[in-house]
């Protein structure tokens, strides 16, 4: 092999090495670019995920805030409705109290009512002797119906007429606005107790009104709610 052949082979080897080096460099470049693109894509996706999570978190906060505000507004509305209902009930109670006060002004009707209240009290207590309290203004009316009340009670239970002692020392308070506008008041009726004071039947007009009103209160509130809903 002469020098020309050797030189030719060397050039071929150099070209081969150079070509292989270029191919390897190209492979490395392509691989590096692919890795870079993958890493870049991963970073982009991670950032997108982070943004989505932040958006969802803020969206949930907004929804929670809306629910809280709605609940507060709903509660405020309910409180207003309940307050309006309470005001209406109070006005109804006040109007009823005024009507009850008028009952004692009709002496004939009130006299019959007093007798009925006394008989009812006696039937509840079923005591042979009782103490009765009334308003000072009603004292003469009570005295006028005592005997007939005792007889009616005795006939109903087939017993001896009871002894009724009218308290002349302690009276029930006068009607509203009688003298002391800010003190206790009584629209009428009686309070009957056993002699030892252990059993008491409060049969005043105010107590009867309160009992009736408490029984009717659920029905009244139901009607008020239906009126508001309509």
Curated annotation (Swiss-Prot):
One GO CC term of this entry? proton-transporting two-sector ATPase complex, catalytic domain
The keyword Kinase is annotated on this UniProt entry: no
Name the keywords, alphabetized: Hydrogen ion transport, Ion transport, Transport
Functional description taken from the UniProt entry: Subunit of the peripheral V1 complex of vacuolar ATPase essential for assembly or catalytic function. V-ATPase is responsible for acidifying a variety of intracellular compartments in eukaryotic cells.
User: Oligomeric state and partners?
Assistant: V-ATPase is a heteromultimeric enzyme composed of a peripheral catalytic V1 complex (components A to H) attached to an integral membrane V0 proton pore complex (components: a, c, c', c'' and d).
Q: Which organism is it from?
A: Citrus unshiu (Satsuma mandarin)
The record ties this protein, via Pfam families, to: vATP-synt_E (PF01991)
GO molecular function terms listed in the Swiss-Prot or TrEMBL record: proton-transporting ATPase activity, rotational mechanism
> What name has this protein been given in UniProt?
V-type proton ATPase subunit E
Family designation: Belongs to the V-ATPase E subunit family.
- SUPFAM superfamilies per the UniProt record, alphabetical: V-type ATPase subunit E-like (SSF160527)
Q: Which PANTHER family match?
A: ATPASE H+-TRANSPORTING V1 SUBUNIT E1A-RELATED
């Amino acid at each position: 092999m002469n020098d020309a052949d050797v030189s030719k082979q060397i050039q071929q080897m150099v070209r081969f090495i150079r070509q292989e080096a270029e191919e390897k460099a190209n492979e490395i470049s392509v691989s590096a670019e692919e890795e870079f693109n993958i890493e870049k894509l991963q970073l982009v996706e991670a950032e997108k995920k982070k943004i989505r999570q932040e958006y969802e978190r803020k969206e949930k906060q907004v929804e929670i805030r809306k629910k809280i505000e709605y609940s507060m507004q709903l509660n405020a509305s309910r409180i207003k409705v309940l307050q309006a209902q309470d005001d209406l009930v109070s006005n109804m109670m006040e109007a009823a109290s005024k009507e009850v006060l008028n009952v004692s002004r009709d002496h004939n009707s009130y006299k019959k009512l007093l007798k009925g209240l006394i008989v009812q009290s006696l039937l509840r207590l079923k005591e042979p002797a009782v103490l009765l309290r009334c308003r000072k203004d009603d004292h003469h009316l009570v005295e006028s119906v005592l005997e007939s009340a005792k007889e009616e009670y005795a006939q109903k239970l087939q017993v001896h007429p009871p002894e009724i002692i009218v308290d002349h020392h302690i009276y029930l308070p006068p009607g509203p606005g009688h003298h002391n506008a800010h003190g206790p008041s009584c629209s009428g009726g009686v309070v009957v107790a056993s002699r030892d004071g252990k059993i008491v039947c409060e049969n005043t007009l105010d107590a009867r009104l309160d009992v009736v009103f408490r029984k009717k209160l659920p029905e009244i509130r139901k009607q008020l709610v239906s009126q508001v809903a309509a």
